[in-house]
Swiss-Prot record:
Pfam families: Exonuc_VII_L (PF02601), tRNA_anti_2 (PF13742). It is found in: Cytoplasm. Belongs to the XseA family. GO terms for cellular component: cytoplasm; exodeoxyribonuclease VII complex. PANTHER family: EXODEOXYRIBONUCLEASE 7 LARGE SUBUNIT (PTHR30008:SF0). It comes from Desulforudis audaxviator (strain MP104C). Its EC number is 3.1.11.6. This is Exodeoxyribonuclease 7 large subunit. One of its GO terms (biological process) is DNA catabolic process.
Length: 406
Protein backbone atom coordinates (compact mmCIF):
# COMPACT_ATOMS: atom_id res chain seq x y z
CA UNK A 1 0.00 0.00 0.00
CA UNK A 2 1.47 3.33 -1.01
CA UNK A 3 2.35 5.77 1.79
CA UNK A 4 0.22 8.87 1.95
CA UNK A 5 2.12 11.85 0.58
CA UNK A 6 2.59 14.74 3.06
CA UNK A 7 2.93 18.14 1.51
CA UNK A 8 4.48 21.00 3.57
CA UNK A 9 4.86 24.67 2.87
CA UNK A 10 8.19 26.41 2.38
CA UNK A 11 7.64 28.19 5.67
CA UNK A 12 7.01 24.90 7.49
CA UNK A 13 10.10 23.31 5.99
CA UNK A 14 12.25 26.31 6.76
CA UNK A 15 10.86 26.44 10.31
CA UNK A 16 11.64 22.76 10.78
CA UNK A 17 15.22 23.24 9.60
CA UNK A 18 15.56 26.30 11.85
CA UNK A 19 14.32 24.39 14.89
CA UNK A 20 16.68 21.47 14.25
CA UNK A 21 19.69 23.72 13.74
CA UNK A 22 19.07 26.05 16.66
CA UNK A 23 18.35 23.21 19.10
CA UNK A 24 21.68 21.52 18.40
CA UNK A 25 23.95 22.18 21.45
CA UNK A 26 27.09 21.98 19.30
CA UNK A 27 25.87 24.77 17.04
CA UNK A 28 24.81 26.95 19.99
CA UNK A 29 28.41 27.91 20.78
CA UNK A 30 31.01 27.54 18.03
CA UNK A 31 34.37 29.05 17.10
CA UNK A 32 34.87 29.37 13.35
CA UNK A 33 38.14 30.30 11.64
CA UNK A 34 38.07 31.90 8.20
CA UNK A 35 38.98 34.79 5.97
CA UNK A 36 36.77 37.87 6.02
CA UNK A 37 35.20 38.83 2.69
CA UNK A 38 32.40 41.10 1.43
CA UNK A 39 32.41 42.97 4.73
CA UNK A 40 29.82 45.77 4.86
CA UNK A 41 28.43 47.93 7.66
CA UNK A 42 24.71 48.71 7.57
CA UNK A 43 23.49 52.22 8.53
CA UNK A 44 21.91 50.58 11.59
CA UNK A 45 25.42 49.69 12.79
CA UNK A 46 25.14 45.96 12.12
CA UNK A 47 28.01 44.24 10.31
CA UNK A 48 27.54 41.71 7.49
CA UNK A 49 30.34 39.62 5.97
CA UNK A 50 31.37 36.14 4.86
CA UNK A 51 33.87 33.78 6.44
CA UNK A 52 35.48 31.58 3.83
CA UNK A 53 38.25 29.07 3.30
CA UNK A 54 39.39 27.21 0.21
CA UNK A 55 36.32 24.94 0.19
CA UNK A 56 33.33 26.83 1.59
CA UNK A 57 31.93 30.02 2.96
CA UNK A 58 29.30 31.07 5.51
CA UNK A 59 27.37 34.29 5.96
CA UNK A 60 28.02 36.09 9.27
CA UNK A 61 25.90 38.72 11.01
CA UNK A 62 27.24 40.81 13.90
CA UNK A 63 24.75 43.12 15.58
CA UNK A 64 25.64 46.67 16.57
CA UNK A 65 25.93 45.88 20.31
CA UNK A 66 28.63 43.31 19.53
CA UNK A 67 30.39 45.46 16.92
CA UNK A 68 31.04 48.16 19.54
CA UNK A 69 33.00 45.63 21.61
CA UNK A 70 35.14 44.23 18.80
CA UNK A 71 38.72 43.67 19.79
CA UNK A 72 40.11 43.27 16.26
CA UNK A 73 39.42 45.15 13.01
CA UNK A 74 37.28 43.15 10.58
CA UNK A 75 38.65 43.89 7.13
CA UNK A 76 38.44 41.96 3.90
CA UNK A 77 41.30 39.51 3.60
CA UNK A 78 42.06 39.17 7.33
CA UNK A 79 41.85 35.78 8.99
CA UNK A 80 39.95 35.77 12.26
CA UNK A 81 38.26 33.40 14.70
CA UNK A 82 34.59 34.25 15.17
CA UNK A 83 32.62 33.12 18.22
CA UNK A 84 28.84 32.74 17.93
CA UNK A 85 25.87 30.49 17.28
CA UNK A 86 24.19 29.14 14.13
CA UNK A 87 20.73 30.26 13.09
CA UNK A 88 18.40 30.39 10.08
CA UNK A 89 17.22 33.56 8.36
CA UNK A 90 13.82 32.31 7.25
CA UNK A 91 13.03 35.06 4.73
CA UNK A 92 15.96 34.05 2.51
CA UNK A 93 16.03 30.43 3.58
CA UNK A 94 19.70 30.78 4.58
CA UNK A 95 21.57 29.54 7.58
CA UNK A 96 24.12 32.00 8.98
CA UNK A 97 26.48 32.54 11.88
CA UNK A 98 25.42 35.15 14.44
CA UNK A 99 28.73 36.49 15.75
CA UNK A 100 29.13 37.36 19.43
CA UNK A 101 32.81 38.20 19.18
CA UNK A 102 35.88 37.97 17.00
CA UNK A 103 39.57 37.54 17.71
CA UNK A 104 42.70 37.47 15.66
CA UNK A 105 43.92 34.07 14.48
CA UNK A 106 45.89 32.46 17.26
CA UNK A 107 43.78 34.12 19.94
CA UNK A 108 42.40 30.75 20.91
CA UNK A 109 45.84 29.60 22.02
CA UNK A 110 46.38 32.86 23.88
CA UNK A 111 43.03 32.43 25.60
CA UNK A 112 43.93 28.90 26.67
CA UNK A 113 47.30 30.08 27.98
CA UNK A 114 45.58 32.86 29.92
CA UNK A 115 43.15 30.40 31.48
CA UNK A 116 46.05 28.15 32.53
CA UNK A 117 47.77 31.14 34.14
CA UNK A 118 44.60 32.05 36.02
CA UNK A 119 44.24 28.49 37.30
CA UNK A 120 47.87 28.47 38.47
CA UNK A 121 47.60 31.79 40.30
CA UNK A 122 44.27 30.73 41.79
CA UNK A 123 45.87 27.59 43.26
CA UNK A 124 48.68 29.67 44.75
CA UNK A 125 46.20 31.96 46.50
CA UNK A 126 46.89 35.16 44.56
CA UNK A 127 43.15 35.70 44.01
CA UNK A 128 42.13 34.91 47.60
CA UNK A 129 39.62 37.56 48.76
CA UNK A 130 40.79 37.11 52.37
CA UNK A 131 44.18 38.67 51.60
CA UNK A 132 42.77 41.80 49.99
CA UNK A 133 43.39 44.94 52.05
CA UNK A 134 41.18 47.92 52.69
CA UNK A 135 42.14 51.22 51.08
CA UNK A 136 43.35 54.05 53.36
CA UNK A 137 40.62 56.54 54.26
CA UNK A 138 42.74 59.69 53.86
CA UNK A 139 45.84 59.00 51.75
CA UNK A 140 48.59 61.61 51.71
CA UNK A 141 50.38 60.22 48.63
CA UNK A 142 48.93 58.18 45.76
CA UNK A 143 51.31 56.28 43.48
CA UNK A 144 50.19 56.01 39.85
CA UNK A 145 51.60 53.44 37.41
CA UNK A 146 50.46 54.34 33.88
CA UNK A 147 51.51 56.02 30.65
CA UNK A 148 52.61 59.64 31.16
CA UNK A 149 50.88 60.68 27.91
CA UNK A 150 47.65 58.68 28.16
CA UNK A 151 44.16 59.83 29.04
CA UNK A 152 44.22 57.69 32.19
CA UNK A 153 46.68 59.98 33.97
CA UNK A 154 44.71 63.08 33.02
CA UNK A 155 41.48 61.55 34.33
CA UNK A 156 43.11 60.51 37.61
CA UNK A 157 44.64 63.95 38.22
CA UNK A 158 41.38 65.74 37.36
CA UNK A 159 39.32 63.64 39.74
CA UNK A 160 41.84 63.82 42.60
CA UNK A 161 42.25 67.60 42.35
CA UNK A 162 38.51 68.04 42.45
CA UNK A 163 37.78 65.55 45.24
CA UNK A 164 40.80 65.81 47.54
CA UNK A 165 43.36 68.54 46.66
CA UNK A 166 45.72 67.79 49.63
CA UNK A 167 46.67 64.39 48.17
CA UNK A 168 50.01 64.18 46.34
CA UNK A 169 50.47 62.10 43.18
CA UNK A 170 53.73 60.21 42.63
CA UNK A 171 53.85 59.08 38.98
CA UNK A 172 55.83 56.03 37.90
CA UNK A 173 55.70 56.39 34.07
CA UNK A 174 55.55 53.14 32.08
CA UNK A 175 54.54 51.72 28.73
CA UNK A 176 51.12 50.10 29.03
CA UNK A 177 51.41 47.90 25.94
CA UNK A 178 54.21 46.26 24.04
CA UNK A 179 56.83 43.65 24.87
CA UNK A 180 58.51 45.62 27.67
CA UNK A 181 55.28 46.86 29.28
CA UNK A 182 54.84 43.99 31.81
CA UNK A 183 58.38 44.41 33.15
CA UNK A 184 58.09 48.19 33.32
CA UNK A 185 54.82 47.94 35.24
CA UNK A 186 56.21 45.37 37.69
CA UNK A 187 59.36 47.43 38.28
CA UNK A 188 57.29 50.58 38.82
CA UNK A 189 55.17 48.86 41.49
CA UNK A 190 58.32 47.72 43.31
CA UNK A 191 59.86 51.20 43.01
CA UNK A 192 56.81 52.83 44.61
CA UNK A 193 56.99 50.29 47.45
CA UNK A 194 60.56 51.36 48.07
CA UNK A 195 59.95 55.09 47.74
CA UNK A 196 58.44 55.50 51.20
CA UNK A 197 55.36 57.50 52.09
CA UNK A 198 53.10 56.06 49.37
CA UNK A 199 49.72 55.06 50.84
CA UNK A 200 48.00 53.45 47.84
CA UNK A 201 48.91 52.59 44.22
CA UNK A 202 46.75 52.87 41.09
CA UNK A 203 47.86 50.61 38.20
CA UNK A 204 46.10 50.89 34.86
CA UNK A 205 45.44 52.41 31.48
CA UNK A 206 42.59 54.08 29.63
CA UNK A 207 40.90 51.03 28.14
CA UNK A 208 41.65 49.44 24.78
CA UNK A 209 41.04 46.33 22.73
CA UNK A 210 41.54 42.98 24.53
CA UNK A 211 44.92 42.36 22.89
CA UNK A 212 46.06 45.81 24.06
CA UNK A 213 45.47 44.73 27.66
CA UNK A 214 47.97 41.86 27.39
CA UNK A 215 50.47 43.44 29.80
CA UNK A 216 47.89 43.26 32.58
CA UNK A 217 47.35 39.55 31.94
CA UNK A 218 50.96 38.54 32.66
CA UNK A 219 52.40 36.64 35.59
CA UNK A 220 55.14 39.19 36.24
CA UNK A 221 52.60 41.98 36.81
CA UNK A 222 50.36 39.70 38.89
CA UNK A 223 53.21 38.77 41.23
CA UNK A 224 54.37 42.37 41.58
CA UNK A 225 50.86 43.36 42.68
CA UNK A 226 50.65 40.37 45.04
CA UNK A 227 54.02 41.18 46.64
CA UNK A 228 53.22 44.88 47.09
CA UNK A 229 53.15 46.01 50.74
CA UNK A 230 50.95 48.91 49.64
CA UNK A 231 47.29 48.36 48.64
CA UNK A 232 46.90 48.28 44.85
CA UNK A 233 43.91 49.43 42.78
CA UNK A 234 43.67 48.09 39.23
CA UNK A 235 42.14 50.47 36.69
CA UNK A 236 42.48 48.88 33.27
CA UNK A 237 39.47 50.73 31.91
CA UNK A 238 37.69 47.79 30.33
CA UNK A 239 34.48 46.79 32.08
CA UNK A 240 33.78 43.73 29.90
CA UNK A 241 37.10 41.90 30.28
CA UNK A 242 38.51 41.10 33.72
CA UNK A 243 42.30 40.95 33.63
CA UNK A 244 44.65 38.99 35.87
CA UNK A 245 45.71 42.30 37.44
CA UNK A 246 42.07 42.93 38.37
CA UNK A 247 41.86 39.55 40.11
CA UNK A 248 45.05 40.03 42.15
CA UNK A 249 44.59 43.70 43.09
CA UNK A 250 43.10 44.73 46.42
CA UNK A 251 40.46 46.77 44.59
CA UNK A 252 39.21 46.70 41.00
CA UNK A 253 37.97 49.91 39.39
CA UNK A 254 36.29 49.82 35.95
CA UNK A 255 38.03 53.04 34.83
CA UNK A 256 40.93 55.27 35.94
CA UNK A 257 38.38 57.91 36.98
CA UNK A 258 36.61 55.36 39.18
CA UNK A 259 39.98 54.38 40.67
CA UNK A 260 40.67 58.00 41.66
CA UNK A 261 37.22 58.21 43.24
CA UNK A 262 37.93 55.01 45.18
CA UNK A 263 41.28 56.08 46.65
CA UNK A 264 40.50 59.65 47.76
CA UNK A 265 37.45 60.97 49.62
CA UNK A 266 35.19 63.76 48.40
CA UNK A 267 36.17 66.92 50.27
CA UNK A 268 32.56 68.11 50.31
CA UNK A 269 31.41 64.87 51.92
CA UNK A 270 34.25 65.09 54.46
CA UNK A 271 33.27 68.66 55.32
CA UNK A 272 29.67 67.59 55.76
CA UNK A 273 30.70 64.71 58.03
CA UNK A 274 32.94 67.01 60.08
CA UNK A 275 30.13 69.54 60.40
CA UNK A 276 27.80 66.77 61.54
CA UNK A 277 30.34 65.54 64.10
CA UNK A 278 30.91 69.10 65.32
CA UNK A 279 27.17 69.58 65.69
CA UNK A 280 26.76 66.33 67.64
CA UNK A 281 29.74 67.19 69.84
CA UNK A 282 28.30 70.64 70.55
CA UNK A 283 24.95 69.15 71.52
CA UNK A 284 26.65 66.59 73.76
CA UNK A 285 28.70 69.27 75.54
CA UNK A 286 25.66 71.50 76.03
CA UNK A 287 23.66 68.57 77.38
CA UNK A 288 26.44 67.64 79.79
CA UNK A 289 26.74 71.22 81.00
CA UNK A 290 23.00 71.37 81.56
CA UNK A 291 23.13 68.17 83.64
CA UNK A 292 26.00 69.53 85.76
CA UNK A 293 24.16 72.83 86.15
CA UNK A 294 21.13 71.00 87.54
CA UNK A 295 23.30 68.98 89.92
CA UNK A 296 25.12 72.10 91.09
CA UNK A 297 21.83 73.87 91.71
CA UNK A 298 20.59 70.89 93.73
CA UNK A 299 23.73 71.00 95.86
CA UNK A 300 23.40 74.73 96.33
CA UNK A 301 19.87 74.27 97.67
CA UNK A 302 21.01 71.96 100.48
CA UNK A 303 20.93 73.54 103.99
CA UNK A 304 24.60 72.96 104.58
CA UNK A 305 25.48 75.11 101.59
CA UNK A 306 23.45 77.99 103.09
CA UNK A 307 25.77 78.14 106.17
CA UNK A 308 29.01 76.29 105.41
CA UNK A 309 30.61 77.66 108.63
CA UNK A 310 28.42 75.33 110.71
CA UNK A 311 29.74 72.34 108.80
CA UNK A 312 33.34 73.53 109.27
CA UNK A 313 32.83 73.96 113.05
CA UNK A 314 31.40 70.47 113.32
CA UNK A 315 34.32 69.06 111.42
CA UNK A 316 36.80 70.94 113.66
CA UNK A 317 35.10 69.52 116.78
CA UNK A 318 35.35 66.03 115.36
CA UNK A 319 39.06 66.56 114.59
CA UNK A 320 39.68 67.94 118.11
CA UNK A 321 37.93 64.97 119.69
CA UNK A 322 39.99 62.59 117.61
CA UNK A 323 43.20 64.39 118.63
CA UNK A 324 42.30 64.04 122.32
CA UNK A 325 41.46 60.37 121.94
CA UNK A 326 44.69 59.78 120.05
CA UNK A 327 46.76 61.60 122.70
CA UNK A 328 45.18 59.57 125.52
CA UNK A 329 45.75 56.32 123.68
CA UNK A 330 49.42 57.19 123.04
CA UNK A 331 49.91 58.08 126.75
CA UNK A 332 48.37 54.84 127.93
CA UNK A 333 50.44 52.79 125.55
CA UNK A 334 53.62 54.62 126.59
CA UNK A 335 52.93 54.05 130.34
CA UNK A 336 52.21 50.38 129.80
CA UNK A 337 55.46 50.07 127.86
CA UNK A 338 57.49 51.74 130.59
CA UNK A 339 56.03 49.41 133.24
CA UNK A 340 56.85 46.31 131.22
CA UNK A 341 60.35 47.63 130.57
CA UNK A 342 60.96 48.17 134.31
CA UNK A 343 59.86 44.61 135.13
CA UNK A 344 62.05 43.11 132.43
CA UNK A 345 64.98 45.29 133.48
CA UNK A 346 64.66 44.05 137.09
CA UNK A 347 64.66 40.47 135.96
CA UNK A 348 67.68 41.05 133.79
CA UNK A 349 69.51 42.85 136.60
CA UNK A 350 68.90 39.95 138.98
CA UNK A 351 70.50 37.57 136.54
CA UNK A 352 73.53 39.78 135.90
CA UNK A 353 76.98 38.37 136.96
CA UNK A 354 77.84 41.78 138.42
CA UNK A 355 75.11 41.34 141.06
CA UNK A 356 76.61 37.98 142.02
CA UNK A 357 80.05 39.58 142.40
CA UNK A 358 78.53 42.32 144.55
CA UNK A 359 77.45 39.67 147.05
CA UNK A 360 81.13 38.68 147.64
CA UNK A 361 81.67 36.13 144.96
CA UNK A 362 84.50 36.24 142.39
CA UNK A 363 85.35 34.78 139.00
CA UNK A 364 88.65 32.95 138.51
CA UNK A 365 90.11 32.68 135.01
CA UNK A 366 93.23 30.99 133.77
CA UNK A 367 95.83 32.90 131.80
CA UNK A 368 94.16 31.82 128.56
CA UNK A 369 90.83 33.31 129.70
CA UNK A 370 89.04 30.07 130.54
CA UNK A 371 86.95 30.10 133.73
CA UNK A 372 88.22 27.88 136.53
CA UNK A 373 85.22 25.91 137.80
CA UNK A 374 87.03 23.56 140.26
CA UNK A 375 90.44 23.07 141.83
CA UNK A 376 91.35 20.38 139.39
CA UNK A 377 91.23 22.95 136.63
CA UNK A 378 94.60 24.53 137.70
CA UNK A 379 97.95 23.37 138.93
CA UNK A 380 100.25 24.74 141.65
CA UNK A 381 102.57 27.38 140.25
CA UNK A 382 100.03 28.46 137.62
CA UNK A 383 99.01 32.09 137.52
CA UNK A 384 95.29 32.95 137.54
CA UNK A 385 93.23 36.15 137.39
CA UNK A 386 90.51 36.63 140.01
CA UNK A 387 87.79 39.17 139.12
CA UNK A 388 85.97 40.84 142.01
CA UNK A 389 82.93 43.17 142.10
CA UNK A 390 85.38 46.03 141.71
CA UNK A 391 88.71 45.19 140.07
CA UNK A 392 90.69 41.98 139.96
CA UNK A 393 93.74 40.14 141.33
CA UNK A 394 96.61 38.35 139.62
CA UNK A 395 97.47 35.37 141.85
CA UNK A 396 99.97 32.53 141.83
CA UNK A 397 98.52 29.17 142.83
CA UNK A 398 100.59 27.64 145.59
CA UNK A 399 98.36 24.75 146.45
CA UNK A 400 95.04 23.26 145.41
CA UNK A 401 92.43 21.72 147.73
CA UNK A 402 89.79 19.15 147.03
CA UNK A 403 86.23 20.28 146.46
CA UNK A 404 84.39 21.35 149.63
CA UNK A 405 81.76 23.87 150.59
CA UNK A 406 83.01 27.30 151.70
Amino acid sequence: MAREMRIVSVRELTGYIKERLESDPFLAHVWVRGEVSACTRHPSGHLYFFLKDEAARIRVVMFRSQVSRLGVPLENGTTVVVRGYLGVYERNGEYQLYAQGAEAEGAGKLHAALERLKEKLQREGLFDPARKRALPALPDTVGVVTSPVGAALKDILTIMRRRWPPARVLLAPVSVQGETAPYEIAQAIRALNGAGGVDVIIVGRGGGAPEELAAFNTEVVARAIFESRIPVVSAVGHEKDVTVADLVADWRAPTPSAAAEAVVPDQRAVRERLAAVESRLGRAVRHRLAVYRVRLEALRQRPVMASPGVLCRRRREVVRSLEERLGGAIGRRTGEGRSRLAVLSGRLEALSPLQVLARGYSICRRADGRIVRDADGVSPGERVIIWLHAGGLSCLVEETFPSRNP
